[in-house]
């Protein structure tokens, strides 16, 4: 049962099974949600060259608290992937946690599951392309310009990665992943994704130390200017997020 004893409804598409509460926003939009996810699914599989032989199960919840209760750990969350096949996500009038991100996690684990969260989140953000509606590359350029940029080689450390705000680390790693793929090719990136030691794998696959790759990436990002109006909007979004966390 969902919140308030709401009955659970189900909807099945070619590659998904959706669960959601009766008379919720998810129930109202379920046909659109299923169609949207099917398009995301096909693109991810096309890029990664793999396709699950099972259906992905989506648990669409009205609140972060409901996500925690349905999953069973009672830890409020907007969305996350629970391998091998489940995704829990908030879907309401204000928050719609659907799209590429969690599906990319589940599907990419058919290739491998590299240890650094930065690499896994970077690939998911590569598919997302945007954070808060703004391109990963623009965020990375903004962070570089304002002194907030965090080096990608440092982010390979799990502890260091989680010490920093995901609003900074996720777009940076998404843009870095995009740069690796566009610079060296998809095949080499998939070779890297399969490495047990990512730092050593960068040397093996790309012939460069992680710090060298970071510097080349930062130099590339620095080639692009950002519209002042967009910079102002990014500053506003970061300030709003900071205010929400402190309230």
Q: Would you name each region that the model predicts?
A:
Residues 5-116, 134, 198-205:
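Juxtacatalytic substrate-recognition/specificity segment
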Residues 67, 72-83, 87-94, 110-246:
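Acidic/His/Gly-enriched intrinsically disordered linker/tail segments
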């Amino acid at each position: 049962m969902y919140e308030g004893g709401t009955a659970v409804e189900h909807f099945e598409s070619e590659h998904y099974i959706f669960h959601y509460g009766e008379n919720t926003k998810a129930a109202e939009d379920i046909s659109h949600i299923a169609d949207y996810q099917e398009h995301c699914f096909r693109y991810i599989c096309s890029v990664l060259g793999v396709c699950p032989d099972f259906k992905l199960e989506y648990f669409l919840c009205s609140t972060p608290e409901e996500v925690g209760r349905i999953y069973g750990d009672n830890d409020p969350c907007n969305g996350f992937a629970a391998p091998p096949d489940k995704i829990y996500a908030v879907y309401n009038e204000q928050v719609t946690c659907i799209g590429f991100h969690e599906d990319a996690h589940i599907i990419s684990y058919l290739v491998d599951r590299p240890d650094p969260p930065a690499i896994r989140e970077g690939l998911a953000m590569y598919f997302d392309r945007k954070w808060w509606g703004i391109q990963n590359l623009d965020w990375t350029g903004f962070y570089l310009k304002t002194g907030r940029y965090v080096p990608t080689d440092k982010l390979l450390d799990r502890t260091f990665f989680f010490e920093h705000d995901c609003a900074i680390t996720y777009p940076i790693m998404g843009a870095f992943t995009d740069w690796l793929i566009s610079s060296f090719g998809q095949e080499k990136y998939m070779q890297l994704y399969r490495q047990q030691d990512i730092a050593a794998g960068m040397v093996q696959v790309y012939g460069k130390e992680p710090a060298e790759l970071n510097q080349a990436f930062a130099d590339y990002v620095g080639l692009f200017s950002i519209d002042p109006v967009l910079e102002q909007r990014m500053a506003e979004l970061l300030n709003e997020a900071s205010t929400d966390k402190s309230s």
